[in-house]
Amino acid sequence: MATKFPKFSQDLAQDPTTRRIWYAMAMGNDFESHDGMTEENLYQKIFATHFGHLAIIFLWASSLLFHVAWQGNFEQWIKDPLHVRPIAHAIWDPHFGKPAIEAFTQAGANGPVNIAYSGVYHWWYTIGMRTNTELYTGSVFLLLFASLFLFAGWLHLQPKFRPSLAWFKSAESRLNHHLAGLFGVSSLAWAGHLIHVAIPESRGQHVGWDNFLSTAPHPAGLQPFFTGNWGVYAQNPDTAGHIFSTSQGAGTAILTFLGGFHPQTESLWLTDMAHHHLAIAVLFIVAGHMYRTNFGIGHSIKEMMNAKTFFGKPVEGPFNMPHQGIYDTYNNSLHFQLGWHLACLGVVTSWVAQHMYSLPSYAFIAKDYTTQAALYTHHQYIAIFLMVGAFAHGAIFLVRDYDPEQNKGNVLERVLQHKEAIISHLSWVSLFLGFHTLGLYVHNDVVVAFGTPEKQILIEPVFAQFIQAAHGKVLYGLDTLLSNPDSVAYTAYPNYANVWLPGWLDAINSGTNSLFLTIGPGDFLVHHAIALGLHTTTLILVKGALDARGSKLMPDKKDFGYAFPCDGPGRGGTCDISAWDSFYLSLFWALNTVGWVTFYWHWKHLGIWQGNVAQFNENSTYLMGWFRDYLWANSAQLINGYNPYGVNNLSVWAWMFLFGHLVWATGFMFLISWRGYWQELIETLVWAHERTPIANLVRWKDKPVALSIVQARVVGLAHFTVGYVLTYAAFLIASTAGKFG
């Protein structure tokens, strides 16, 4: 007899109801729970999947290169990056009528195409690519690389090539490999690429496979490097009049510290970026060699964690940093590790979103407004999912892997012991921010509605303005630090030698970029609304994790696992308190918050890009301003994507906007109705099916049963999330592209 799905659980495979399918989908990634799983096998399987993951990434990048080379307009775009719109790929759609074909035949193409809003054109141009042939070459290289990684994944599942458990648990060796080998060496390689290929190309000198070994990146060669005269590499940088990709105004420097932006491309200086990557490489290669591996030198992390000394002095009592037992706790729990990794990656992804627009690194991308908006929004959305996932796996760690004996007296136990103080403080700050921020918005809304806008309560963000002034913004007249030429920040080494400072001060005070935007009362309010969202999301997640093992209401909660709906009517009030439920609730708040973040960023930038900052400044201080002047006003073009007179090239976004709303609203059907309703409905449908001629020829083996409460919540949450993302993505791209192309 054929074995039934799922193979990883005999219990589920023998379930006679449709529960078999749903539970199998839910448990597919929970490798720990699979039949016959050992710790060693678990590590080996996860290790092998990393190669598959990398193969998918390389395949994806290869497909971008291939489609742009085949169907894009890269060679036309680089001749005029500010006015030619980059093509992602052609569209083949047999349903298109003549008006649609005309609407989507754009950007100089001879058939319907999609426009690229990902920034890949700017990236490839900046790093030295100039022809379709180079794109094809890169595509084939990445395809071969993907194949190699797929093979490596398969190989590491073969008995002879499976690493042992001890190999996986050698933390110092892994740090050595990741810090020095991956981060350090790849940064060094990237610095090498920028110096040997990208910088010469930016100065009009082609470097390819044919001549890169014979073309020296600097006239002085390696002599300054070996004689310690490194300053030579910073002399004669590109001038302010440099025309990108030509020799006009070009210098010879390869490692500089100019600060600010290239005047023509409005992106960071390539020579500054090469310097940055070289510095990162040195730091990480050193960092990777600090820990004790096979040679008996360097730090042992376990010894450091367990030592009760701080810089050689013994520390005891409440103010020490008790990490005893943490090494083994971390090293033996994949959920603990994953929680940390997701948290770090989440922070850095949000950080990338902030830096990609304020300090653009790719040539001319600062003037491709739709791409800027898409990249910011994309990275902030990714960040919230990673952060919520971090807390989810932290909670699973506390339920499944935390050992109270092993962690006696260390920081983990301390956090659990004073969880009431942590949770109540988060609750207090959420209430404070919520009532005060909403109070100000509602007050302002009411007085504006009654025709007395002068009665609004408008608060200048003086502390934030002070921080901007300290970094050199002179607009506010707060002469302090870098905005005061006489201050020590201005005159201290190395600034007196005019290193980096002039470029930075020009950039921060220019008004045409997104560096340290001018802020006022509208920013003050929305900042606190975002703070409310962040703190409430954190409250839900932290409470869920810290109460995951047990609470006063349910002391034995850990015995019920990570996700349970309720413990029946016998213990009233145990519904909604599993750690999974806190993950579920927090995601609504996380989406709410990222909505406010992206609304704020987008509306503020629309004003800057259109040269009309007054609209945001005057109308962001009350609720109707946000609804009317941001959401409603900017969806006007969108809902006109197609009308009785035909279609335009926004029609696909108009359709997606409607479809996103539909998916989002469908979520509530699962979120607001409970299991009994669906069970009755299914039984009625089965009854009807079995009595309908022809239809009743189709039978099924599994008895149809409704989703469990937790599963229905997952389905509802998935629809809510996907609909939310689709709706805002369509709104963002259409409202920006409709104005700026």
From Swiss-Prot:
Chlorophyll a B1 binds at residue 661. The chain crosses the membrane at residues 46-69, 135-158, 175-199, 273-291, 334-357, 373-399, 421-443, 524-542, 582-603, 650-672, 714-734. SUPFAM superfamilies: Photosystem I subunits PsaA/PsaB. [4Fe-4S] cluster binds at residues 566, 575. Chlorophyll a B3 binds at residues 669, 677. It is an enzyme of class 1 (oxidoreductase). GO terms for cellular component: photosystem I; plasma membrane-derived thylakoid membrane. It is a multi-pass membrane protein. It comes from the Bacteria. One of its GO terms (biological process) is photosynthesis. It is found in: Cellular thylakoid membrane. Its EC number is 1.97.1.12. Keywords: 4Fe-4S, Chlorophyll, Chromophore, Electron transport, Iron, Iron-sulfur, Magnesium, Membrane, Metal-binding, Oxidoreductase, Photosynthesis, Photosystem I, Thylakoid, Transmembrane, Transmembrane helix, Transport. Phylloquinone binds at residue 678. PSI electron transfer chain: 5 chlorophyll a, 1 chlorophyll a', 2 phylloquinones and 3 4Fe-4S clusters. PSI core antenna: 90 chlorophyll a, 22 carotenoids, 3 phospholipids and 1 galactolipid. P700 is a chlorophyll a/chlorophyll a' dimer, A0 is one or more chlorophyll a, A1 is one or both phylloquinones and FX is a shared 4Fe-4S iron-sulfur center. Its main location: membrane. It catalyses: reduced [plastocyanin] + hnu + oxidized [2Fe-2S]-[ferredoxin] = oxidized [plastocyanin] + reduced [2Fe-2S]-[ferredoxin]. Pfam families: PsaA_PsaB. GO terms for molecular function: 4 iron, 4 sulfur cluster binding; chlorophyll binding; electron transfer activity; magnesium ion binding; oxidoreductase activity. Belongs to the PsaA/PsaB family. The PsaA/B heterodimer binds the P700 chlorophyll special pair and subsequent electron acceptors. PSI consists of a core antenna complex that captures photons, and an electron transfer chain that converts photonic excitation into a charge separation. The cyanobacterial PSI reaction center is composed of one copy each of PsaA,B,C,D,E,F,I,J,K,L,M and X, and forms trimeric complexes. NCBIfam families: psaB (TIGR01336). PsaA and PsaB bind P700, the primary electron donor of photosystem I (PSI), as well as the electron acceptors A0, A1 and FX. PSI is a plastocyanin/cytochrome c6-ferredoxin oxidoreductase, converting photonic excitation into a charge separation, which transfers an electron from the donor P700 chlorophyll pair to the spectroscopically characterized acceptors A0, A1, FX, FA and FB in turn. Oxidized P700 is reduced on the lumenal side of the thylakoid membrane by plastocyanin or cytochrome c6. This is Photosystem I P700 chlorophyll a apoprotein A2 1. It comes from Nostoc sp. (strain PCC 7120 / SAG 25.82 / UTEX 2576).
